[in-house]
Swiss-Prot record:
UniProt lineage: Bacteria, Pseudomonadati, Pseudomonadota, Alphaproteobacteria, Hyphomicrobiales
InterPro entries assigned to the protein according to its UniProt record, in alphabetical order: Ribosomal_uL18_bac-type, Ribosomal_uL18_bac/euk
Record's protein name: Large ribosomal subunit protein uL18
Start and end residues of each stretch annotated as Disordered: 1-26
Organism: Bradyrhizobium diazoefficiens (strain JCM 10833 / BCRC 13528 / IAM 13628 / NBRC 14792 / USDA 110)
Record's keyword annotation contains rRNA-binding: yes
Assembly description: Part of the 50S ribosomal subunit; part of the 5S rRNA/L5/L18/L25 subcomplex. Contacts the 5S and 23S rRNAs.
Keyword Ribonucleoprotein applies: yes
Similarity-based family: Belongs to the universal ribosomal protein uL18 family.
Amino acid sequence: MSKAKVTNARRKRSVRLKLRRSGGGRPRLSVFRSSKHIYAQVIDDLKGETLASASSLEKSMRDGGKTGADIDAAKAVGKLLAERAAEKGVKEVVFDRGSYLYHGRVKALADAARESGLSF
């Protein structure tokens, strides 16, 4: 493993552990972004299960023929995830950005989730 990958993995693990300690039992909204798509899921760490998930790979997102790697796709994923979480009765989460900066697609997803009813 290269030094950059090791450092990135350590940072990601550190962020996740801090959130689990300070989460107070709230579910965790975890974000993963690749060069072509963005994924998000609401995870209950106490039970070890995923409560809701959404990604730019879903058929409803791909109908526009646009890429899943832009800010508009991130906003749509955030909105969809918040709706699915609300169906499961989840209103409060802890935001887990992993090793990604709170900027661009990650920020757009978080803002859209907040506007759609999730609080964090």
